[in-house]
Amino acid sequence: MAPEVASHVERHCTTIRRGPDYLFHLILDSMVDDYAVVVDRVTASLDSLERGVFKDPSPHQLARLLKLKRTVSRLRKTLVLEREVLARLMRGEFELVNEREIAYYRNVYDHLVRYTELIESAREMVSDLMQTHLAAASNRLNHIMKY
């Protein structure tokens, strides 16, 4: 995060003249951009787990689902809190952001909203996969008990 911001400041010396609120925007934007990688990893893990749950609903798959559920829950909590702080900044609750910089903060806010929605979908999918895993395990146990 910091190297990208430092590089931007070095390349565009006018950044400093725009004030600390613009510099803060650059830092926030860089932080929020890093969430894209995390959300992609969560999505990839979900895809892998989905295939595994339908192929072989093992206790290992359930442990991975529980771990991913905790990760998604923590990430969602973080995203929601950051989104709320940004919303308050844009509403002017803190007199830290110059009016002309609000549009930049709104862009960061929009990204946070998008990532929050993706993580919310991931949270629902984890719950669905857990239900599927438990149903498949129950079916397998019923099948074994028949014989």
Language model: regions and residue ranges:
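Peripheral, non-transmembrane regulatory/ligand-interaction domains of membrane transport proteins
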Residues: 1-100, 104-121, 127
